[in-house]
Amino acid sequence: HSVTVYEKSSYERLGLPHKDTFDESAMEFAGLEVPESWRAPNNIITIVPLDSEVVPLTLPEDKNARSLIVERKELIRHLISLAEEAGVSFVYGEEVLAPVMLGSRVGGIVTSGGVRYCDLVIDACGVHSPLRRAMPEFTRVQNEPGEFDVLHTYRAYYEKVEGEQEPATRYNIILKNDGTVGMSWLITEEDAVDVLIARFRGTDLSGFCEPLNELYEQYGHMGKKLLRGGRITDIPVRQPLAVFVADGYAAVGDSAFMTYAVKGSGIAYSLMAGTLLANALEQDEDCLFNCDTLWEYEKAFFRQIGFDACRTALMKNLLPYLTAKEVSDLFAAKVITTEDLAELNSGSLGSLLNSQMISKVKEKLRQLKGMPELRKKLLDMVVWFGKLTIIEPFFPSKYDRDGVAKWAERYNEFFEAIKYHPAEAESE
């Protein structure tokens, strides 16, 4: 196939100025060799609750994990070089603006350089993709993310002040705000302090000043000199799109909300999804690139990745229900343990069968007899998992417009119905 990638940035400006962590298994899935310099010790994560009297929880190391840590720019350039070796062409400085619709089919793209016709458009434009946002309603491709579907994140590296005491734990996730607000992390590296502040509500840089100052005050080894980064980016933290294919169109990565919902990391899922898409296209001997062909890609994704991602998204959807104090109470009462958090971080919770998950949550409910509000919120999760069990069988094995429409309606209505709405909660 003749493949051309259109990118609005220049080659030199590609990639955010920070490091990414993902598991080596994703590279193996895609059949890619791993540069030895990317291999790194597994991160040991500590959760720091609001109440300073509650002991932070440090997760045990996931012995099955094989962590890779690489600068984003290096990762992108490595993947570009592999693509170029395979014959892919890259056009830089040309922004994708909209799809070209030829009847019911996507027949190309409109870019800042003109109209580009093609047989298949692969949408990797990101969380705010102009292609996905313009897809017609009949395709059932959801145009916009909903409330609490996106985290607005500030990430930067600050100087590390020599001589100041460093935290006992290197990688700290700080839960000092209610779930409807967001969270922060602070990672102490050899030569810098890596800071991320995430908020569900959109804001400019001024909105991150207060939480940034709180980190300065709490962690004396964090200096005020910005070394690099300092940009605001949006990360999808939700279930994958119900439908991400149409005639002549397939979405991958953040364009289809393919991230691990409790982390926001999408590199592993994107590598795997790209591989599944390539496999489906190779089976299309007539190069029709229509819904029949591309549904095989979506089906493979949901069966191998997507439904596990949905179960993880259910757990993420509980977070906005919780106040910072409730999180501290859960830690103090040992309702949430290091083992629970380790499973959530590794993704093994998401792969549990619904019946196993419900049993696990019911066990926790017995520990919450003295906390009626928390017990009710956890009970909601039991109901969610039960409802998801009913929805999954509606996923069509073959593409049929009516069947796909019914699937998308059930799927989207379910995830929208379980969202927490603060205004509604205050009026109850």
PLM-predicted stretches and their roles:
Residues H1-V5:
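N-terminal Rossmann-like FAD-binding beta1-loop-alpha1 element of flavoenzymes
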Residues Y6, I122, G253:
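Active-site flanking residues adjacent to catalytic metal/cofactor-binding acidic residues
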Residues K8-D51:
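N-terminal FAD cofactor-binding segment of flavoenzymes
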Residues E53-E71, G108, E189-R199:
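Helix-loop-beta segment of a Rossmann-like dinucleotide-binding subdomain
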Residues L57, K176-M183, I187-P240, A246-D247, ...:
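Mobile, glycine/GP-rich and aromatic-enriched active-site lid/loop segments adjacent to catalytic centers
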Residues L82-M222, F257:
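Predominantly flavin-linked oxidoreductase catalytic cores and closely associated redox partners
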Residues V96, T203-A300, Q304, A313:
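FAD/FMN-dependent oxidoreductases across multiple families
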Residues E282-E428:
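C-terminal helical "tail/cap" subdomain of flavin- and related membrane-associated enzymes
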